[in-house]
């Protein structure tokens, strides 16, 4: 199972599998039912590569949420230079089970229309598109988002409508999806496959309230994980305004999250307005530095060759950190990073955009040369 968990699942799951998941969900009453459901989901994700989860493995996974060996911790850089985000990644067997469970949750639950993250056919671009051409864009960030969602909160949600799960089944799912956090509380780990989907489940009530609040003030509202955006033509965002007071009351007093004041910003039309990293002043765009970074990476590769470009990339772009619990350093290949950046550029600007097409042509030529070199070496 460990080897299978490292391999990527299929990009698309057959409709027959999702239909089967919905049917089994309607008959979910016992741990045995849950095991069958997870295995059906894993078959849908991995096909012939799937390894069935045994009852013993499910029990071991479910009843060891306080075991520190279930997760290993590493850091990834934030956009702000010198700052890092801590990721708690599950060990392979736990990750494998969580992947199956995540497909189940995504199949049986439809997130609120304002939730743009971790939902099929929604993205940072669809979220940003809502706020195009507005006079004002107001962004806020929820502090320590994943660790604010406790196991008790998840259990309560799973035993309530629309899930209405048996208490024992809800408890097993909660144990699989939560871990003992830095302060000893059982919370959502940032790094588990199930965590993003669960945040949308937990935030549904808040999304409903904030959508209603936005409508009352003639605003548009969207949320991508912990990033919340309002936009509109009227400035109702004064520090002591009725809107801001209502907003804080909903988020902090009623829903138990905390607004991060350091990441709260109001952008006027004359400024660069961004929603989850996408510029929305007139049309969706990426920041200039993003394209500049791509051009620099491609230029270094074209002028100095792949190996020297890789060395420069590791020196200037790859943070000096390792995964302490596993002893394995993260692997960063410049060609993979460029490919990912180009995919994002394509998603935001479109495949017919001249900037994207020019950069993609340069990358394709470099990749052809790299493949030819590899063939000659063989």
Question: Where on the chain are the PLM-derived regions?
Answer:
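Catalytic palm active-site di-aspartate
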Residues: 139-143, 191, 195, 217-234
């Amino acid at each position: 199972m460990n080897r299978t968990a490292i391999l990527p699942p299929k990009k698309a799951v057959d409709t027959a599998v999702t239909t089967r998941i919905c049917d089994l969900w309607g008959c979910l009453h016992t741990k045995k039912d849950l095991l069958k459901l997870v295995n059906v989901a894993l078959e849908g994700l991995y096909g012939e590569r799937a390894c069935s989860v045994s009852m013993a493995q499910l029990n071991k996974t479910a009843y060891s949420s306080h075991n520190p060996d279930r997760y290993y911790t590493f850091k990834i850089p934030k956009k702000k230079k010198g700052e890092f985000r801590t990721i708690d990644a599950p060990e392979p067997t736990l990750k494998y089970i969580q992947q199956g469970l995540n497909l189940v949750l995504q199949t049986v639950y439809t997130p609120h229309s304002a939730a743009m993250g971790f939902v099929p056919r929604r993205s940072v671009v669809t979220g940003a598109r809502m706020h195009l051409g507005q006079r004002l864009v107001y962004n806020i960030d929820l502090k320590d988002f994943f660790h604010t969602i406790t196991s008790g909160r998840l259990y309560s949600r799973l035993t309530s409508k629309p899930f209405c799960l048996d208490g024992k089944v809800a408890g097993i799912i909660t144990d699989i999806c939560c871990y003992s956090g830095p302060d000893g509380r059982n919370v959502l780990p940032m790094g588990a496959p199930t965590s993003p989907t669960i945040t949308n489940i937990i935030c549904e009530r808040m999304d409903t309230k904030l959508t209603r609040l936005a409508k009352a003030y003639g605003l548009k509202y969207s949320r991508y994980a912990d990033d919340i955006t309002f936009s509109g033509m009227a400035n109702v965002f004064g520090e002591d305004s009725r809107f801001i007071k209502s907003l804080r009351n909903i988020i902090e007093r009623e829903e138990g999250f905390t607004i991060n004041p350091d990441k709260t910003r109001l952008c006027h039309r004359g400024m660069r307005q961004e929603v989850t990293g996408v510029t929305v002043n007139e049309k969706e765009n990426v920041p200039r530095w993003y394209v500049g970074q791509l051009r620099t990476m491609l230029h270094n590769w074209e002028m100095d060759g792949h190996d020297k470009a890789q060395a420069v990339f590791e020196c200037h772009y790859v943070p000096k950190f390792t995964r302490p619990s596993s002893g394995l350093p993260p692997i960063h290949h410049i060609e993979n990073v460029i490919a990912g950046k180009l995919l994002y550029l394509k998603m935001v600007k479109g495949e017919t955009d001249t900037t994207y097409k020019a950069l993609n042509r340069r990358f394709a030529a470099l990749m052809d040369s790299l493949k030819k070199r590899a063939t000659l070496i063989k």
